[in-house]
């Protein structure tokens, strides 16, 4: 499985090669050294700072969260013909989940699934230890 380097590692590597390329370029002590500005760096094949960090900025940019309101529900299929329930405008996600849960539990209760589950989960007596487990001498009898 291939490993993906972190953004900081990529940025540090980019800066290392940029410094190495500038130092191995033409000498800056000649008569043209005063004319060597940032635009001249691009002529040496070095990317501009804005071009080298565009991916970094876009990676950490926040993604907008969908607004779950009545008018937005139709766009994501909330109140469409295939939806399970009509959602009133202005409800939040928590109440929507509770409504879905109660509807599903109601459907399960109609089929008897919930009652069978509840009956299997009820504990009538104190749980007994396993056959091979040693007795707890510290517990009251």
From Swiss-Prot:
Superkingdom of origin organism: Eukaryota
Compositional bias annotation for Polar residues: 112-122
Coiled coil residues, start to end: none
Chain spans, region Disordered: 72-141
Range of residues in the leader sequence: none
Biased composition (Low complexity): 95-105
GO biological process, one term: cell differentiation
PANTHER family noted in UniProt: PANCREATIC PROGENITOR CELL DIFFERENTIATION AND PROLIFERATION FACTOR (PTHR14572)
Family from the record: Belongs to the PPDPF family.
Name the UniProt record assigns to this protein: Pancreatic progenitor cell differentiation and proliferation factor-like protein
Gene name linked to the record: PPDPFL
